[in-house]
Amino acid sequence: NPKPYLSFPLRTPTGYSANDASVGDMDGDGIYEIVIHLTGRAKDNSQKGETDPPVFQCYKLDGTFLWEINLGKNIREGAHYTQFMVYDLDGDGKAEIAMKTADGSIDGKGIVIGDSTKNFRNEQGYILSGPEYLTVFDGQTGAALSTVLYDPPRYPDNLFPSTDQLKSLWGDGYGNRMDRFLACVAYLDGVHPSLVMCRGYYT
């Protein structure tokens, strides 16, 4: 008898394991593909320490590998940091994937977003400064389609806020509240899908 699930091997990087997942029709053939968030060394927002870069892979349901996106060292890995939305945002019948990116993120074509030489991790492993981006990727190829500055920012009009500035805005100066994210897709005008990105708990 057929099993009530699908099973196929992943191209899991050493030290990583499968974590969150989402589905969408990436190529417009009417059949879902699956996007898997692969996590290595991760930290809660309240915990010090460096993490491994978040990795995303896309597969067809027969196990065919489509692409890999590596968010790089300037995106911290943990349960609250990366919210990824898989949805047909432009109405062409193919889903895109959208998420927060940073200098050194690598798209599914191997193209670097921003400046790969930058390292914004502080001595405690937190990332509290530097540019933050929102990127929409092509769901079929993983190629970056559009990258803009992430909104809401850590601090208005300042990519390098001080600890005191962060504390005044968020209630702490190390990102425990500031760097907890949520996201959704909503039909705000009743017709077109909009990407909604949220930032900050507890404040």
Enumerate the language-model features and the residues they cover.
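Beta-propeller-forming repeat regions
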Residues: N1-T203
